[in-house]
């Protein structure tokens, strides 16, 4: 596959609950984020997703939708996966 680098659009977004998790339970944060990104890579061909190594960007992700894919649909898919982790339960 050949991709014209000028046509690639990369988005950055933050998931607040994951940023909060990093502040309180950093080891759990890393475990969940690594598993989440791996799962999304294995089960979706609609986008590429990754995290930043800079820990000041905990909770931030970059995503590159496949050509013709809508970023709103991509974000909905990602949030469905995040919701499945039931992260809110760790704060009760």
UniProtKB/Swiss-Prot annotation:
Record keywords: Hydrolase included?
yes
An example GO BP is:
symbiont-mediated suppression of host innate immune response
Which Gene Ontology MF annotations are present?
Answer: endonuclease activity
Q: One Pfam annotation, family name?
A: DM_Arn
Q: Which Gene3D superfamilies match?
A: 3.30.70.2770
Q: Which InterPro entries did the record assign?
A: Anti-Restrict_Endo_sf, Arn
KW Hydrolase (keyword) present: yes
Origin superkingdom: Viruses
Q: Which UniProt keywords apply?
A: Endonuclease, Host-virus interaction, Hydrolase, Inhibition of host innate immune response by virus, Nuclease, Restriction-modification system evasion by virus, Viral immunoevasion
So what does this one do?
Pays a role in the inhibition of the host restriction-modification system. Strongly inhibits the host mcrA endonuclease that cleaves 5-methyl and 5-hydroxymethylcytosines at the specific DNA sequence C(me)CGG.
Q: What is this protein called?
A: Anti-restriction endonuclease
This protein's species is Enterobacteria phage T4
